């Protein structure tokens, strides 16, 4: 498998926010990665003593066959797996949680989201919102799928603490109005 990075950290947002995890970051399209065997990655998981393993990056679908073997091995180590992706590619992988990060002005993979839910996958949607236009587009898109509201997080968009806080105030009011969960992003809360 090609791996861009292996690191330990806290899960930044969503249902498992704040949980310690081992992150296996896959290279994006056109990026280089270091070739690692499944056994080597399982050893890294075992040595990390983390109960959660997050697999993220741009080439999840490209490495699906190796990931199936890796996910099975991680399960044998009694760890939970999270796949973080944008949901545009349908992945047939046995992860404990599919954490889909969405941006309203992009194309929403409604069919894939519904297919994940229909297949019994546990799915959470983390939707990064910046303004009223984002909110309107999101509310329309959400009417077309069957993810429970308890698994939908509205996350404040922002590249710095000031814009993050401004969006958090706006979103808190909208979450109250529409009944969605306001998500937090630890990197801003912790000032990292």
Which ranges hold each PLM region?
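Conserved AdoMet/S-adenosylmethionine-binding subsite of the radical SAM
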Residues: 42, 61-192
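Conserved Radical SAM active-site core
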Residues: 1, 5-11, 20-97
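A generic structural micro-feature
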Residues: 16-18, 119
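Short secondary-structure boundary/capping segments within folded domains
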Residues: 12-16, 173
């Amino acid at each position: 498998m090609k791996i861009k990075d292996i690191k330990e950290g806290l899960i930044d947002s969503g249902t498992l926010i704040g949980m310690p995890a081992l992150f296996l970051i896959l290279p994006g399209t056109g990026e280089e990665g270091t070739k690692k065997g499944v056994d080597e990655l399982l050893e890294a998981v075992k040595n990390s003593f983390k109960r959660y393993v997050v697999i993220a990056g741009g080439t999840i679908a490209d490495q699906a066959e190796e990931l199936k073997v890796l996910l099975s091995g991680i399960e044998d180590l009694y760890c939970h797996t999270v796949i973080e992706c944008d949901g545009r590619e349908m992945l047939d992988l046995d992860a404990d949680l599919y954490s889909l990060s969405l941006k309203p002005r992009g194309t929403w993979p409604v069919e894939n989201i519904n297919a994940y839910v229909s297949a019994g996958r546990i799915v959470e949607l983390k939707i990064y919102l910046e303004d009223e236009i984002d909110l309107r587009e999101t509310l329309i898109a959400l009417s077309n799928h069957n993810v429970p509201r308890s698994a939908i997080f509205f996350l404040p968009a922002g590249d710095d603490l000031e814009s993050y806080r401004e969006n958090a105030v706006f979103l808190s009011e909208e979450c109250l109005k529409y009944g969605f969960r306001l998500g937090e992003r630890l990197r801003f809360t912790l000032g990292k």
